[in-house]
A protein has these predicted regions:
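Mature catalytic core of soluble alpha/beta enzymes
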Residues: 2-8, 12-350
């Protein structure tokens, strides 16, 4: 399950680091199982119970009726099995809007984030729990059916026609939880909520500030030691998403294969990174960028950050390299507190 172990650690640290100043009467917490992971939602304020009820319903609807690749009644399943025929969606439907966002991010990252890798992920067994190493010929054939150019999406006054060409299929797992967090944020705002923490299986959103006015403090997991952490981030109104090699992997003949695939090769990305944490004001972007930056490697990730900043999309990074360094961007200079006992070398980037 993607980021499930990360979810547990983040939840533990989030609760332990933010509890000061809060009382049980001021908050409501609910644990939800959706999107193949355990989610922990905590909402503060008078409308907390009603807001959580709405949030849980929204999550189950997204999971079961919209985004599941395997549930035959879901919209994504129907699209993936449409055999090249155009599927019409309403103007307010969630799935085409999410696909549009995924295509936009794929273009912005020059394909480092690619939502069309469904058949390649299946071949590796990461979506089926039947792990294996595909042959080079098999990967070459599967990759010929990937690429966002095979997704035709239009937005009209009446709705969204979507067509998948040449056997293309979508896997939105790299963006779905972030997008869901965006929707939950909007739902909570409608309910009048101003303070909350949403941990959607490791995709964490801290809404507003704590009720005492201070920032939330979230621990970032150590990819080499799942019982420890790299450091603590102070944040308000931010999404914090981590992608790492420890989340889903298997070993064969002494080689470890992780689930973050390079869209160009169809193989696990070898970028010099073992973990990427993104902090951003948008959940879908944070989710997808964590994957893209991992694929791009340190230099590519930092170049992408600069490019997107020029276009009005700002985000911060914590990069863990395979030689034991932790690189964090200048926007975190006062917000990230390294764990000096972790054994890493920390570098604040100018």
């Amino acid at each position: 399950m993607k980021r499930q172990l990360a979810a547990l650690l983040l939840t533990i640290f989030a609760l332990s680091l933010t509890a000061c100043g809060e009382t049980a009467a001021e908050s409501e917490t609910r644990t939800v199982y959706a999107m193949d992971t355990v989610m922990n939602l905590t909402v503060y304020g008078e409308n907390a119970a009603a807001a959580l009820e709405s949030a849980e319903k929204e999550l189950h609807t997204l999971d079961e009726a919209v985004l599941s690749r395997t549930a035959e009644g879901s919209e994504l399943y129907a699209l993936n099995t449409s055999n090249g025929e155009t599927v019409e969606y309403g103007a307010d439907d969630i799935l085409p809007a999410l696909i549009e966002t995924a295509l936009t991010i794929s273009d912005a990252t020059d394909g480092a984030f690619d939502p069309t890798l469904a058949p390649v992920l299946d071949a590796w067994g990461f979506t089926k729990d039947e792990r294996r190493v595909p042959s080079a010929d098999e990967l070459k054939e599967l990759l010929s059916h990937t690429g966002c150019g095979k997704v035709v999406l239009e937005k009209t006054a009446d709705g969204w026609p979507v067509t998948l060409l040449d056997g293309a299929q979508l896997d939105l797992g790299g963006i779905a939880k972030g997008y869901a967090a965006d929707l939950l944020r909007a739902q909570l705002e409608k309910e009048g909520v101003t303070s909350a923490t949403l941990d959607l299986g490791g995709d964490v959103f801290v809404m507003g500030r704590k009720t005492d006015g201070s920032d939330w403090r979230i621990a970032v997991k150590d990819p080499a030691d799942t019982e420890s952490y790299l450091g603590v981030v102070s944040a308000a109104d931010k999404f914090i998403v981590t992608s790492g090699v420890y989340e889903r992997y298997f070993e064969e003949n002494g080689v470890r294969y992780h689930h973050i695939l390079d869209p160009k090769t169809g193989c696990p990305a070898e970028s010099g990174l073992v973990s990427v944490t993104v902090l951003c004001e948008n959940g879908a972007w944070a989710d997808a960028l964590s994957t893209a930056c991992f694929v791009l490697g340190p230099d590519g990730a930092l170049a992408l950050r600069d490019d997107l900043a020029d276009q009005g999309t700002d985000f911060e990074l914590i990069l863990v390299t395979d030689d034991g360094r932790v690189l964090y961007t200048d926007g975190l200079a006062d917000a990230f507190t390294p764990n000096d006992e972790s054994g890493y070398t920390y570098e604040a980037l100018a």
